[in-house]
Every structure is written in structure tokens, then in C-alpha cells.
């Protein structure tokens, strides 16, 4: 099977300032250096001309591009703007009165950046391998879901309405012009800006093409780097359906010896929240935290470590 290319939405703004670090091909000419585009009269204004979309294709494998003022950590405590650099193709399209910058690149190259953006590139090799498989599975599960909805000419919409309640699920399927976004809403993807390592590249290459499967389908492998000591049912978080491999479990070693209390009971839930139950996340080992978390994830002084919510017993053989 040929490695697929994926499209990642990076930034959406009225004006976008970027730099082509090498030779790129666009609108019949070779261009490089500093560039500026602006939304104008329903199109993209670049070098005095209006376009519906623009594609900048690298002329060699070493060419990259940098986008300025990219917001990361949207609505998180560490939200900030960065200059980020990327390999691959840069595509600019008009979307709802703004310009969206999209990076198109091979899936495995995308994963190398995801691992270094979500977690720290200094993490252990086996940890990085597990992350590569989980992130790859999540990515392809979303692409398959998006394709299925497109084939049926359906959009993502999931809600329950009763006389007293209106419950709406908001997932990442609201992306219609690219496969995934670059922030925590999907998976963090910060291009080649984040320091990578030989171990990250080895982890992705060693697991190339490996996916988590369940009943001949790709697992929708949701994951988190912090928790409250227990995982939640998929259907209460993402969509009105449940998967056996994304069920509620105790997030701790020797799970079978540490039964999870019934957190649907108010008194049990309050006790759980107000105390510090034994869990993978409950660590104060600064060495471990600094090894696996990027700097901005350590700015809020709480105990968090990486832990995936896929139950081990449901991993495919």
C-alpha cells in the first residue's frame, strides 16, 4: 500500500505572513523568501493578484516553509503564538472570510512531528513506539470516518434531545477542508519546530504502518497525557456510541486489585475528586515528568504523566 499524504490545517487568519526557506513552485514560477497574503474581495491577494487558492510546492526535499504567529494551545493555560516551520507543500485556501494555511505531507513524516509535539522527544524508545502506533491509529480512523461521511453525503452531527435535556457532542469532524488540525483539538503538530530525536524517527520507522485493530476496523484510539485516575466511556465524551476498547477503567497498575468505585454516585464522585487516588497520573517525580512532557505542559504544577486509554486486554494480536 502506498503511503498516503495527509492535509493538516495550521492557521486561519485574515492575513498570513510566511517565509519560503528554499525554492518553491507556485503559479508557474519559482519563488522563495518572505511572503505575505491577505484576504480581499473573496480571494487571496498575493503580489498584487487575486487567487481562489495558492499552492507552494517544494522543489527539493530540503526546502521548508515557516509560518509566523501560529497560535498553539488554543484555550489552554499555556496558549501562545509561535513561528513554526514545516516540510512538504503549503496550500492556501479561502474559508469563511479568512485564509487557511494547510500543510500537505506524507503520513509517517506527520507522525514524527506529532510525537515530538505531543510529548517530549527525550522519552524512552518503547514509550515513543507506543505513541506512534496510537497516534497513527487515531489519524487513520478519523480519515476513514471522514471519507465514510463524505461518501454518504452526511456531516457529523450527534445530539440527544429530551423534555429536560439537550446533549450535543462536538468532535473533530467539523474539519471539512483538511484531514486534521494542528492543535490539541486533534493532535499537536508543530512541524519541524519542535526538537526531535533519533529515537522519535526510529520509533515511527520501526512501527511503520502498524495500527490498532478491533473487529477488522481501525481503533479510534483516543489518548490523553493527564487524567483523574479513571478513563471515561467514549460515548460520554465524543459521540453517541461506545467502543469496547474505550470503556471506563481504573487508570492504575494492578487494576484488578484496585476496583473503581461507582462514580455515578454523588458521594463516591466527591470522595474521588477531593482525595488523591492511586493512578498513573499521580506522580511527583520531576525527572519522569521532564523526560516525557514538553516545557509548556509543565508550567501548570499538577501531577500528569502520559497514559493511553486503550485497555491492554483489547489490543489486537
Indicate where each model-derived feature is located:
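Conserved, single-site charged/polar hotspot
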Residues: 1-317
